Amino acid sequence: MARTLLNTSGFNTYSNPSKLKITDMRIAVLGHGNWRWPIIKLYTNQGLIGLGEVRDGASARYALMLKSRLLGENPCDVDRLFRSLTQFGGAGRLGGGVCGVEMALMDLAGKAWGVPCYMLAGGKHRDRVKCYADTPARPDPEEMGNLLKDRMVSGFEFLKMDIGVQ
């Protein structure tokens, strides 16, 4: 019996990663009130769906403009696809669409290969991550202080303040 160097027990047997192709891209918007979180959904010919978040107010419409560059492509080819998408601007608010697509590609690649997508990004480096609390600016210093104090009482050790100079 031939000895294999690759343990295939963890692979998704319903997926053939080398023949995986993106067939559609859609946006689902989650949220309520003034808060909206566009989620990119990449669909494949093998029934896998990859999800990625369009970050902090970036344009979901811009993300959809990238669709034509993705259809028919193998989502496991994350780096090449990411580089082709960043030709059209990667910084600022437009970059959020590209970042969301990259997340969805990594999600698909991880599902296709049967591994968590963090393994595709270099592996696990820690067991826990500390979160910070963003705090929008308030014109009244006392009100700002109370907001920060409330976040500290809630258990946050790291605080971010959106302040400006006027």
Regions found by a protein language model. Name each.
Residues 46, 113-137, 165:
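N-terminal small/glycine-rich loop or linker at the start of catalytic domains
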Residues 15, 32-33, 123-125, 152-153:
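Solvent-exposed alpha-helices and their adjacent loops that cap or buttress functional pockets
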Residues 128-166:
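Metal-dependent enolase-superfamily TIM-barrel catalytic cores that perform enediolate-based chemistry
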